[in-house]
C-alpha cells in the first residue's frame, strides 16, 4: 500500500505494508525529506477523515493497520513550535541539554572591569571606561589573545540582534545548522535533482572562513599519567595508537562563558597498530564502544572525544621526535578532519537555541605529536559547523596533500554548490578564491587550548591510572586476566588495608574488567562504582559496604585460587 505525507517539505509517497510499525514508515519518510526534528515534535493526522492529530512518537509502536490507515491516505505532518509568545529570556528548555549548558544559558557572562585612570566618579559610580563588557567583546578577545569566543558568548551576541529583550515578541531561535544537501522534494513545479533544479532547492554558494566561536574552549586532562600511559604504547612498540576520551564537561572560567572537557580516562578500542597509522574493524569497535559508553554512564562519564598519536623518533637518542605538524605543513590532515566531522555528526550537541533542537558538537580531537622543540606535545581541535555540513552532504574527501581537502564531483545523488574561500595574495590583499578542485583544510579547523588542573578544586574521579593493564594491549604483552587482578587487589585485601584497596579500585580499566566478569550483581556493581568514584575518606568508608556482599566474597575466593 501507499501512504501520502504532506508537510512543509511538499508531498511524498511512501510504500509500506499494513503489518509494518508506523515508526518504520515514518523513518522512511524522514530519510526522504532529510527532516531532523524528533518524533516528539511531529504531529500526524489524516485530514480527509477528520482524525485527530497525534504526536508521532505515540503512534510509532503501532502498525499501520492498527491505526486504521488505508491505501492512498493523505497524512498531514506538522511540527510543534519551539517557543511561544515569550520574552527573549524564555527560550524553550531542552531536557537533553547538558547541565553546563543550562547553567551558562542562565548567566549574562559580563566581563567585569576595574576603575581606570579615566574614570571621574566615586567607588559606587560607573562610566563607559569601567562598565562591564559583553562576553563577545572583540577588544577583550584581542587583548587576551583569544582566537575564538565561547559558544554561549556567540549565542548571546546573536540573541542581541535576533531577539530584542524589550519587544516581548515570539522567540526566534538564533541558530540554524548549515545544510548543504539539495532538496529533492522541492515544492516548485519542476522535476527533482538531477533532472531539474531551482533557487529554492539548491543550497547557496558556500564562503569558507575561520569560525569565530568554538563549542569547547579547553581540554583538561585530570592527570599527566593519563597521557603518559597512552604514549607508552608508542614508546614500547614504535606503533601509533588511538583512543577515546571519557569524562565530563564543566565551565571554564578563563574564557567568558567558556566550557572545558575534563578527561578522566582514555579507552583504546581493538586496533592493529602500524608505524604510520592504524586499522580497525569498525563494526566490532562500534559494538565495543557502545558497551563502554553504557558502563561509563554508570560512573557519571561520557565520551568526550578521541586522541591519537603521530610520532616518529628523531634518532638522536635523547627522546626527541620529529615535528611534522606546523603552520607550513598541516595541523590536521584532510582525512583526520573528515573523521573528526563524522564523529561530531554522531555526537550532536542538544541546544535550545537552534531551530533543529541541536547544534554542532562538543566532541574534541586531540593529537599527540612533536612540537617545534622536538618534544612530545598534545594539540586539541574541533572542526567547524561548515566541515560537519560538507561531510554530511558528501561534498569533500581526503587528498594526497594532507593540508588540502578535495571537492567531489557532482552526481545524481550529490549536488556540489559553488565554494569559495578568502586568502591574502602575495601583495597582502584579501581576495576570494574558488575552492575547486581543492582548498586548505585550515578553514575547517577550530583550535582549543589544553592542559592539566591548576588547583584541585574538583578531585579526579579515578585515583589509579596505571597498575592494572589497559584493555586491548595484547600486542604489547599486556593482558587483562585473573592473574593481573590478583596482583593488583589481593595484597591490600589480605592485609586489610582498605585505604589502599580503595585507591586501587579507583581505576577506570579495572572497573571495565570487573564488569565484564559478571560476578557482581547490579546492586553490588553500583556499590563498587560508588567506592571507585568517591574520594577518600568517604570512599574508604564505602568499601565496608562493598566487601560484605556475596559477589565480592566470590571474587576474593577466585583471586585466592588463581595461580
Curated annotation (Swiss-Prot):
Keywords: Cytoplasm, Endoplasmic reticulum, Membrane, mRNA transport, Nucleus, Protein transport, Translocation, Transport. It is found in: Cytoplasm, Perinuclear region; Endoplasmic reticulum membrane; Nucleus membrane. One of its GO terms (cellular component) is perinuclear region of cytoplasm. The keyword Transmembrane helix does not apply. It comes from Eremothecium gossypii (strain ATCC 10895 / CBS 109.51 / FGSC 9923 / NRRL Y-1056). Involved in the import of nuclear-targeted proteins into the nucleus and the export of poly(A) RNA out of the nucleus. Has a role in the endoplasmic reticulum-associated degradation (ERAD) pathway. The keyword Transport applies. InterPro entries: MPN, Npl4, NPL4_C, Npl4_Ub-like_dom, NPL4_Zn-bd_put. Belongs to the NPL4 family. The gene is NPL4. GO terms for molecular function: ubiquitin binding; ubiquitin protein ligase binding. It comes from the Eukaryota. GO terms for biological process: mRNA transport; protein transport; ubiquitin-dependent protein catabolic process. This is Nuclear protein localization protein 4. Its main location: cytoplasm. Pfam families: NPL4 (PF05021), UN_NPL4 (PF11543), zf-NPL4 (PF05020).
Amino acid at each position: 500500500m501507499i501512504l501520502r505525507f504532506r508537510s512543509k517539505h511538499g508531498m511524498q509517497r511512501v510504500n509500506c505494508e499494513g503489518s509494518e510499525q508506523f515508526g518504520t514508515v515514518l523513518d522512511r519518510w524522514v530519510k526522504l525529506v532529510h527532516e531532523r526534528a524528533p518524533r516528539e515534535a511531529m504531529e500526524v493526522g489524516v485530514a480527509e477523515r477528520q482524525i485527530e492529530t497525534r504526536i508521532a512518537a505515540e503512534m510509532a509502536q503501532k502498525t499501520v493497520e492498527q491505526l486504521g490507515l488505508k491505501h492512498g491516505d493523505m497524512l498531514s505532518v506538522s511540527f510543534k513550535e519551539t517557543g511561544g509568545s515569550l520574552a527573549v529570556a524564555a527560550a524553550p528548555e531542552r531536557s537533553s541539554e547538558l547541565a553546563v549548558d543550562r547553567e551558562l544559558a542562565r548567566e549574562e557572562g559580563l566581563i567585569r572591569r576595574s576603575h581606570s585612570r579615566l574614570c571621574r566618579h566615586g567607588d559606587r559610580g560607573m562610566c563607559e571606561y569601567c562598565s562591564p563588557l559583553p562576553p563577545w567583546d572583540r577588544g577583550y578577545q584581542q587583548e587576551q589573545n583569544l582566537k575564538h569566543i565561547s559558544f554561549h558568548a556567540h549565542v548571546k551576541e546573536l540573541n542581541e540582534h535576533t531577539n530584542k529583550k524589550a519587544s516581548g515578541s515570539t522567540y526566534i531561535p538564533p541558530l540554524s545548522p548549515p545544510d548543504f544537501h539539495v532538496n529533492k522534494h522541492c515544492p516548485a513545479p519542476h522535476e527533482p535533482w538531477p533532472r531539474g533544479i531551482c533557487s529554492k532547492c539548491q543550497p547557496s554558494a558556500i564562503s569558507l572562513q575561520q569560525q569565530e566561536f568554538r563549542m569547547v574552549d579547553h581540554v583538561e586532562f585530570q592527570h599527566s599519567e593519563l597521557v603518559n600511559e597512552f604514549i607508552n604504547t608508542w614508546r614500547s612498540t614504535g606503533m601509533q595508537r588511538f583512543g577515546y576520551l571519557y569524562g565530563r564537561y564543566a565551565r571554564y572560567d578563563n574564557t567568558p562563558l567558556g566550557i572545558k572537557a575534563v578527561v578522566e580516562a582514555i579507552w583504546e578500542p581493538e586496533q592493529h597498530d602500524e608505524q604510520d597509522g592504524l586499522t580497525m574493524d569498525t563494526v566490532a569497535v562500534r559494538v565495543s564502544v557502545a558497551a563502554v559508553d553504557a558502563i561509563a554512564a554508570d560512573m557519571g562519564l561520557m565520551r568526550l572525544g578521541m586522541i591519537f598519536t603521530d610520532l616518529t623518533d628523531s634518532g638522536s637518542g635523547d627522546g626527541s621526535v620529529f615535528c611534522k605538524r606546523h603552520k607550513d605543513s598541516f595541523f590536521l590532515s584532510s582525512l583526520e578532519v573528515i573523521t573528526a566531522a563524522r564523529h561530531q555528526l554522531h555526537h550532536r550537541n542538544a541546544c535550545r537555541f537552534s531551530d533543529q533542537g541541536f547544534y554542532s558538537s562538543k566532541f574534541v580531537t586531540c593529537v599527540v605529536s612533536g612540537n617545534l622543540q622536538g618534544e612530545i606535545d598534545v594539540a586539541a581541535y574541533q572542526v567547524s559547523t561548515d566541515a560537519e555540513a560538507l561531510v554530511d552532504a558528501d561534498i569533500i574527501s581526503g587528498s594526497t596533500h594532507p593540508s588540502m581537502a578535495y571537492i567531489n564531483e557532482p552526481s545524481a545523488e550529490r549536488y556540489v554548490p559553488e565554494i569559495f574561500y578568502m586568502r591574502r595574495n602575495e601583495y597582502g590583499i584579501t581576495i576570494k578564491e574558488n575552492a575547486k578542485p581543492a582548498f586548505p583544510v585550515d578553514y575547517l579547523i577550530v583550535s582549543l587550548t589544553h592542559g592539566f588542573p591548576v588547583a584541585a578544586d574538583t578531585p579526579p574521579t579515578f585515583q589509579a591510572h596505571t597498575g592494572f593493564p589497559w584493555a586491548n594491549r595484547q600486542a604489547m604483552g599486556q593482558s587483562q586476566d585473573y592473574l593481573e587482578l590478583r596482583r593488583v587487589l589481593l595484597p591490600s585485601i589480605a592485609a586489610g588495608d582498605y585505604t589502599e584497596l580503595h585507591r586501587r579500585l579507583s581505576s577506570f580499566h579495572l572497573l571495565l574488567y570487573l564488569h565484564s566478569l559478571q560476578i557482581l550483581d547490579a546492586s553490588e556493581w553500583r556499590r563498587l562504582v560508588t567506592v571507585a568514584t568517591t574520594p577518600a575518606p568517604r570512599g574508604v568508608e564505602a568499601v565496608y559496604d562493598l566487601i560484605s556482599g556475596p559477589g565480592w566474597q566470590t571474587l576474593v575466593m577466585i583471586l585466592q585460587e588463581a595461580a
